[in-house]
């Protein structure tokens, strides 16, 4: 019995020790929060008074500490002193401080607070570093703190930009830090390199618990390297600023690891996160990103695209309207967005009207002139545009050479033009491929207006680049998760089904319909010359319309009274 009791006590003690190494909840005492190195702490901060935080028993081989605190969207403040000063405190959703330790120092204190009305749920952690590790933000000249390990994040509809202060070489306790601008040789901070990492949260999940859970993977060097995607490596000669394509409604965490190649040591900055939207905005908040106008527009567009996917080649004029709508609508949207400040909803309505005009114009060109090569050039360019967009949607689009606008647009145009050139000898196959691929992709765009998917950024990234002159510097990585694979499978299934069905149905049929205007002229001449044709005796359209109007008018006239009649003569 005694052995069993000892076994139970040992198991409980081990479980408590493992849990404590990962997370600690709550406060140890009123107004005082105790931390341990490397342990995550969850707690709430309230507005009235700042709370004091403390760390005991700091190891003698620790040279500096980095404290960081995270919340989802409400700001919190961390400060060296109870009085908040700009050069000794930091405020934000992801903020922190560097504590340079003095000789024999074994205790460290700081203060936490919030200016928000509502209580703020936070997660915080302390990380320790030795004298061989580089100091993140140790050569700060741009921001308020003397040593600033924070990553500053700005976003708009087009791009998200992160900025951070350069690091410095590590140094022992009680020793002056190495000068930041004394030289550019290998004995100075100019040998340091910066690896920028990007981590995507699960799609369509805006919960606070999910964010704080995944932030734990982005605080220390080994976890960042194992979990996140390395986007770019910067040297000390590069500008400490990196831009990414904004993904509204998609949670993204960014972090920077500074590496000393001479000592092979690293340190992590404080990760920053964003959803590229506001949780507190009334209109267009993170919880209601999909506009009604977008849903209506892309739903109608998808219905037409779905029809084109399976029946486009048979209904040739309808397909031409669809292609003309895409071409004219795309260029008009770019033009009106760049030249005018009108609202999105009005812009979308004008785009729909202009696209319809473009579609009818292409149909009219075919009906009157019947030049197949011009129509198929438009069809092939639309397919080439999508294939070129898919090409730059891959990691190829993030190559440094394509950050130059001239190189990008020339390469993009060459790929788009190459498609109709390659298929110019088999126009029917080109037309059916365009119907299947473009028609099915319109369904993907409609799905995105209701349920976010990364596949919409295939064309949206190109549109952003055409609209924004600074988008060329942005990295266009997107998450590719379970729902994206499902929608990709739907896209592929629709495209293959539509192409296969149309190829089988069009066997033995003429490649394309005859010239409509010639048929109309031949029919008109036949009716004029052939008096045996019953249609020859049909009155002209004007007389038929006049007769029909006369009949309708007679329905509203009163019947005249019958007058005196002459009797029959026997």
UniProtKB/Swiss-Prot annotation:
<feature type="transmembrane region" description="Helical">
    <location>
        <begin position="479"/>
        <end position="501"/>
    </location>
</feature>
<feature type="transmembrane region" description="Helical">
    <location>
        <begin position="320"/>
        <end position="342"/>
    </location>
</feature>
<feature type="glycosylation site" description="N-linked (GlcNAc...) asparagine">
    <location>
        <position position="27"/>
    </location>
</feature>
<feature type="signal peptide">
    <location>
        <begin position="1"/>
        <end position="21"/>
    </location>
</feature>
<dbReference type="GO" id="GO:0043069">
    <property type="term" value="P:negative regulation of programmed cell death"/>
</dbReference>
<dbReference type="GO" id="GO:0032024">
    <property type="term" value="P:positive regulation of insulin secretion"/>
</dbReference>
<dbReference type="GO" id="GO:0070062">
    <property type="term" value="C:extracellular exosome"/>
</dbReference>
<dbReference type="GO" id="GO:0034620">
    <property type="term" value="P:cellular response to unfolded protein"/>
</dbReference>
<keyword id="KW-0346">Stress response</keyword>
<keyword id="KW-1133">Transmembrane helix</keyword>
<keyword id="KW-0812">Transmembrane</keyword>
<keyword id="KW-0732">Signal</keyword>
<feature type="glycosylation site" description="N-linked (GlcNAc...) asparagine">
    <location>
        <position position="264"/>
    </location>
</feature>
<keyword id="KW-1003">Cell membrane</keyword>
<feature type="transmembrane region" description="Helical">
    <location>
        <begin position="296"/>
        <end position="313"/>
    </location>
</feature>
<feature type="glycosylation site" description="N-linked (GlcNAc...) asparagine">
    <location>
        <position position="87"/>
    </location>
</feature>
<dbReference type="InterPro" id="IPR025256">
    <property type="entry name" value="TM7S3/TM198-like_dom"/>
</dbReference>
<feature type="glycosylation site" description="N-linked (GlcNAc...) asparagine">
    <location>
        <position position="75"/>
    </location>
</feature>
<feature type="transmembrane region" description="Helical">
    <location>
        <begin position="408"/>
        <end position="430"/>
    </location>
</feature>
<dbReference type="InterPro" id="IPR042502">
    <property type="entry name" value="TM7SF3"/>
</dbReference>
<feature type="glycosylation site" description="N-linked (GlcNAc...) asparagine">
    <location>
        <position position="61"/>
    </location>
</feature>
<keyword id="KW-0325">Glycoprotein</keyword>
<comment type="function">
    <text>Involved in the inhibition of cytokine-induced death of pancreatic beta cells. Involved in the promotion of insulin secretion from pancreatic beta cells. Is a downstream transcriptional target of p53/TP53, and acts as a pro-survival homeostatic factor that attenuates the development of cellular stress. Maintains protein homeostasis and promotes cell survival through attenuation of endoplasmic reticulum (ER) stress and the subsequent induction of unfolded protein response (UPR).</text>
</comment>
<dbReference type="Pfam" id="PF13886">
    <property type="entry name" value="TM7S3_TM198"/>
</dbReference>
<feature type="transmembrane region" description="Helical">
    <location>
        <begin position="371"/>
        <end position="393"/>
    </location>
</feature>
<protein>
    <recommendedName>
        <fullName>Transmembrane 7 superfamily member 3</fullName>
    </recommendedName>
</protein>
<keyword id="KW-0472">Membrane</keyword>
<feature type="transmembrane region" description="Helical">
    <location>
        <begin position="347"/>
        <end position="369"/>
    </location>
</feature>
<dbReference type="GO" id="GO:0005886">
    <property type="term" value="C:plasma membrane"/>
</dbReference>
<feature type="transmembrane region" description="Helical">
    <location>
        <begin position="437"/>
        <end position="459"/>
    </location>
</feature>
């Amino acid at each position: 019995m005694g052995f069993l009791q000892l076994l139970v006590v040992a198991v409980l003690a081990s479980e408590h020790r493992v849990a404590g190494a990962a997370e600690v909840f709550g406060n140890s005492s009123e107004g005082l929060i105790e931390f341990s190195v490397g342990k995550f702490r969850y707690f709430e901060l309230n507005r009235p008074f700042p709370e004091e935080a403390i760390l005991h028993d700091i190891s003698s081989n620790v040279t500096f500490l980095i404290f960081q605190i995270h919340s989802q969207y409400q700001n919190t403040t961390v400060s060296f002193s109870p009085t908040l000063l700009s050069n000794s405190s930091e405020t934000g959703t992801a903020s922190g401080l560097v504590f340079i330790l003095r000789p024999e120092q074994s205790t460290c204190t700081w203060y936490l607070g919030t200016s928000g009305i509502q209580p703020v749920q936070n997660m915080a952690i302390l990380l320790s570093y030795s004298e061989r590790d580089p100091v993140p933000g140790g050569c700060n000249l741009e921001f308020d703190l003397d040593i600033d390990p924070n990553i500053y994040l700005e976003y708009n509809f087009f791009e998200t930009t992160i900025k951070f202060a350069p690091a410095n070489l590590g140094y022992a306790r009680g020793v002056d830090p190495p000068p930041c601008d004394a030289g550019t040789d290998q004995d100075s901070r100019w040998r340091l390199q910066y690896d920028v990492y990007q981590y995507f949260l699960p799609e369509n999940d805006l919960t606070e618990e999910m964010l704080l859970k995944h932030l734990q993977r982005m605080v220390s060097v080994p976890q960042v390297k194992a979990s996140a995607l390395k986007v770019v490596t910067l040297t000390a000669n590069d500008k400490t600023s990196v831009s990414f394509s904004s993904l509204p409604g998609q949670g993204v965490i960014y972090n920077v690891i500074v590496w000393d190649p001479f000592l092979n040591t690293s340190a992590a900055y404080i990760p920053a996160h964003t959803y590229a939207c506001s949780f507190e905005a009334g209109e267009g908040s993170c919880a209601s990103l999909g506009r009604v106008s977008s849903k209506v527009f892309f739903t109608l567009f998808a219905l037409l695209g779905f029809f084109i996917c399976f029946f486009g080649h048979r209904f040739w004029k309808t397909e031409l309207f669809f292609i003309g709508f895409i071409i004219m609508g795309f260029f008009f949207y770019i033009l009106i967005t760049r030249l005018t400040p009108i609202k999105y909803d009005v812009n979308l309505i004008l785009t729909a009207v202009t696209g319809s005009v473009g579609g009818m114009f292409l149909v009219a060109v075919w009906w009157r002139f019947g030049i197949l090569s011009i129509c198929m050039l438009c069809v092939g360019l639309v397919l080439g545009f999508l294939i070129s967009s898919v090409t730059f949607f891959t990691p190829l689009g993030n190559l440094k050479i394509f950050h130059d606008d001239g190189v990008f647009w020339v390469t993009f145009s060459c790929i788009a033009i190459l498609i109709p050139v390659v298929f110019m000898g088999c126009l029917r196959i080109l037309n059916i491929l365009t119907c299947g691929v473009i028609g099915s992709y319109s369904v993907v765009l409609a799905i995105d207006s209701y349920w976010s998917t990364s596949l919409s950024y295939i064309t949206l990234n190109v549109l952003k680049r055409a609209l924004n002159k600074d988008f060329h510097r942005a990295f266009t990585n997107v998450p590719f998760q379970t729902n994206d694979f499902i929608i990709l499978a739907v896209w592929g299934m629709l495209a293959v089904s539509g192409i296969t069905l149309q190829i089988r149905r069009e066997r033995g049929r003429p490649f394309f319909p005859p010239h409509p205007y010639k048929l109309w002229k031949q029919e008109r001449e036949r009716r004029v010359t052939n008096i045996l044709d019953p249609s020859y005796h049909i009155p002209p359209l004007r007389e038929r319309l006049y007769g029909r109007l006369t009949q309708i008018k007679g329905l509203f006239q009163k019947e005249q009274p019958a007058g005196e009649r002459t009797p029959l003569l026997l």
